[in-house]
Swiss-Prot record:
One GO cellular component term: extracellular region
Glycosylation-annotated residues: 165, 394, 663, 731
InterPro entries xref list: PA_domain, Peptidase_S8/S53_dom, Peptidase_S8/S53_dom_sf, Peptidase_S8_Ser-AS, Peptidase_S8_subtilisin-rel, Peptidases_S8_3, S8pro/Inhibitor_I9, S8pro/Inhibitor_I9_sf
Span of domain PA: 384-477
Protein name from the UniProt record: Subtilisin-like protease SBT1.3
Family: Belongs to the peptidase S8 family.
Gene name of this polypeptide: SBT1.3
Enzyme nomenclature, EC number: 3.4.21.-
Signal peptide: 1-25
GO molecular-function terms, A-Z: serine-type endopeptidase activity
């Protein structure tokens, strides 16, 4: 059809031209916008004219930014950090175009964009057996205990807490190279023989978010958030009698390694934690001389060569530092783990045998069990019924109103009533605040399918009880179908001896480790639900700004809480065995872990009450008493970890980010099978090729028990494969002697799902258990 409007084509051309101009402007803006990149360098490639690495790094930045005007900014202002201990490199602000050019430069191994990380947010020592009579040998006072320094990367520390009292501690070892940095409300005297180091890292954070508002948080090691104080006290807090939260969990609070020392590295702020700051803290902590690093945060999963934390902790491991990280709070979804590198000990969360019971009584019909940490001025008489309301559409499918989001509740419908709120979307305590502001007098917090029957107690601002999914559905159904629904709430205090326990926490992130199915993750479980530990004096226990309450101890849940349990036990082991490598300590923790609860039944999963698998609990639940004397260990050195990386289809340049030492090369000692890494867990992965019917994996154990000892092997039966171990007996004649064995898997028929079991070496005094996983990939 002919064009009848002579203006149509020119007008269309103008519109298209304008769109192209905007598109080009937007693209140009994206390319020219600076952000932080972590640049990994090959230090051995530094040319002779340069006298130091900083000079060389500056020239590299200059080479890609030299077209910028001097008025715009100096190149040295682009550099935020340099890294020289755990790994070699720098963090700098670059545009996308500059970063791409820099990656082409000689000596530059990798240029990785800044990553934002998130925090993974008394009774536990007793539950772990560290207060039984036989535990005296573990907590018996030794000078070597005082020599272990645990670096805690978190939100800082509240030094006035009684948990950081240094009474009875020996002088700080001369080998310690750390420092106490001063700043707002943090002086040199805030450090002592317990807190031996305190540093802050914020350049990456400020580059990404702008200057820190010092009216809202301290630009110093002082902790306003509370998370860092809680984790540091869990690792190595001194004993404090009468510790409690509003009378709940009353008892003696103490860290796992109560005589170890703490160095606080503040890397997390109101807006999160940034990789350039975290890496600088790891680098500095290793230079300071820490023996253990406790890192309760995560930032998703990247390939090994693009994961800056993985690269930095590889360097820490090379320097003999044990690294413990939280698995994440992404459970119960599968493949939700973070921090999956084999040289990192990845910790999931479990419950303990302590609870904070509360009840919800609906009408005169029945009573439902729940939990609560509420203690406040408002008390609802337990014998009085109050109107009960649920504003969701149905009992099974939560909606925006049922989540009690801010502004979603109408005072006309909730004033003077107990309100039912579904768990999820917003923090649990915030829901109670929303109910209170709308005039509600109480809250029933109901789990959804995601959380199942797992109960997490909170210090709410109004009377509130949390209940499981099944109970929640019944309570909601009653509220929706009864014309005059009523309920009463009763808070019952603290109860111990809960069965079954431990149970895998529903929120604890799950495997498998999709980067490397041959490496089991998480590695193990530790207590992470309702943990009492020290707290900041600047934040309410609910972490709500409107909450005026202040406490010395708080109860928190998360893999953030389980990680420092393992870090503390690792410090105990290090103090008893100072010559052990990080891998030996990890092996001791994993091979002594248990997989049955206090009812002698297999560990279960709180999200569904079904038995858990190694993808949920790893090698099992930590057992500190046995971990200090494991009998045998599976040791792994830096070169063998590097050999593992050689099996991961990484290019020579990608492998280079892990080689501080230029002479480290692939020797292919694992026969191109990552399952041959001398890991304490054994994973056989049959490929898509159905012609592969058999597979043999090799392990080597080191005797750290009696000089003369004999171990016999036993293996769980599997449906889809036969498993043969050779030899069946290991006879040791000296301490530190190494012996090897092979495990051969022969497929009977390919199973659609992985099979789980265990391999145990047993002597008259020790039992050394490794989880075994057999996986058949679907045929092509």
């Amino acid at each position: 059809m002919a064009n009848k409007n002579p203006l149509q084509k020119p007008f269309l051309f103008i519109i298209l031209s304008i769109n192209l101009i905007f598109l080009q402007a937007e693209t140009t803006t994206q390319i020219s916008t600076k952000k932080t990149y972590v640049i990994h360098m090959d230090k051995s490639a530094m040319p002779l004219p340069y006298t130091n690495h900083l000079q060389w790094y500056s020239s590299k930045i200059n080479s890609v930014t030299q077209h910028k005007s001097q008025e715009e900014e100096g190149n040295n202002n682009r550099i935020l950090y340099t890294y020289q201990t755990a790994f070699h490199g720098l963090a700098a602000q670059l545009t996308q175009e500059e970063a791409e050019r820099l990656e082409e430069e000689d000596g530059v191994v990798a240029v990785i964009p800044e990553t934002r990380y998130e925090l993974h947010t008394t009774r536990s020592p007793t539950f772990l057996g560290l207060e039984r009579q036989e535990s005296e040998r573990v907590w018996a006072e030794r000078v070597t205990d005082h020599d272990v320094v645990v670096g805690v990367l978190d939100t800082g520390i509240w030094p006035e807490s009684e948990s950081f009292n240094d009474t009875g501690m020996s002088p700080v070892p001369a080998t310690w190279r750390g420092a106490c940095e001063t700043g707002k409300r943090f002086l040199k005297r805030n450090c002592n023989r317990k807190i031996v180091g305190a540093r802050v890292f914020y350049r990456g954070y400020e580059a990404a978010t702008g200057k820190i508002d010092e009216e809202l948080e301290y630009k110093s090691p002082r902790d306003r958030d509370g998370h860092g104080t809680h984790t540091a006290a869990t690792v190595a807090g001194s004993p404090v009698k009468g510790a409690n939260l509003f009378g709940f969990a009353y008892g003696t609070a103490r860290g796992m390694a109560q005589k170890a020392r703490v160095a606080a590295y503040k890397v997390c702020w109101v807006g999160g934690c940034f990789s350039s700051d975290i890496l600088s803290a790891v680098d500095q902590a290793v230079a300071d001389g820490v023996q253990v690093l406790s890192i309760s945060l995560g930032g998703g999963v990247s390939t090994y060569s693009r994961d800056s934390l993985s690269i930095a902790t590889f360097g820490a491991m090379e320097m003999g530092v044990f690294v413990s990280c939280s698995a994440g709070n992404g459970g119960p979804d599968p493949i939700s783990l973070t921090n999956v590198s084999p040289w990192i000990t990845t910790v999931g969360a479990s419950t303990m045998d302590r609870d904070f019971p509360a009840t919800v009584k609906i009408g005169t019909m029945r009573t439902f069990k729940g939990v609560s940490l509420y203690k406040g001025r408002t008390v609802l008489p337990k014998n009085k019924q109050y109107p009960l309301v649920y504003l969701g559409r149905n009992a099974s499918s939560p909606d925006p109103t049922s989540f009690c989001l801010d502004g979603a509740l109408d005072r006309r419908h909730v004033a003077g009533k107990i309100v039912i709120c579904d768990r999820g979307v917003t923090p649990r305590v915030q829901k109670g605040q929303v109910v209170k502001r709308a005039g509600g007098i109480g809250m029933v917090l109901t789990n959804t399918a995601t959380n199942g029957e797992e109960l997490v107690a909170d210090s709410h601002m109004l009377p509130a009880v949390a209940v499981g999914e099944k109970e929640g559905k019944l309570i909601k159904q009653y509220a929706m179908t009864s014309k005059k629904a009523t309920a009463s709430l009763e808070i019952l205090g603290t109860r111990i001896g809960i069965k079954p326990s431990p149970v895998v926490a529903a929120f604890s992130s799950r495997g498998p480790n999709f980067l490397s199915l041959e490496i089991l993750k998480p590695d193990l479980l530790a207590p992470g639900v309702n943990i009492l530990a020290a707290w900041t004096g600047d934040m309410a226990p609910s972490s709500l700004s409107s909450d005026p309450r202040r406490v010395k101890f708080n109860i928190l849940s998360g893999t953030s809480m389980s990680c420092p349990h393992v870090s503390g036990v690792a410090a105990l082991i290090k103090s008893r065995h100072p010559d052990w490598s990080p891998a030996a300590i990890k092996s001791a923790l994993m091979t002594t872990a248990y997989v049955h609860d206090n009812m002698f039944k297999p560990l279960t999963d709180a999200s569904g009450a079904a038995p858990s698998s190694p993808y949920d609990h790893g090698a099992g639940h930590i057992d500190p008493l046995r971990a200090t004397d494991p009998g045998l260990v599976y040791d792994i050195g830096p070169q063998e970890y590097f050999e593992f990386l050689c099996t991961q289809d990484l290019s020579p340049s990608q492998l280079k980010v892990f080689t501080k030492h230029s002479n480290r090369t692939c020797k292919h000692t694992l026969a191109k099978n990552p399952g041959n890494l001398n890991y304490p867990a054994i994973s056989a992965l049959f490929p898509e090729n159905t012609h592969v019917k058999a597979m043999t994996l090799r392990r080597t154990v080191t005797n750290v028990g009696p000089h003369i000892s004999s171990y016999k092997v036993s293996v769980s039966p599997f449906k889809g494969a036969s498993v043969t171990v050779q030899p069946k007996t290991l006879n040791f004649t000296s301490k530190h002697q190494k012996l090897s064995y092979t495990v051969t898997f022969r497929t009977r028929f390919r199973m659609k799902r992985p099979e789980f079991g265990g391999l145990v070496w047993k002597s008259t005094t020790h039992k050394v258990r490794s989880p075994v996983i057999i996986t058949w990939l679907p045929p092509l």
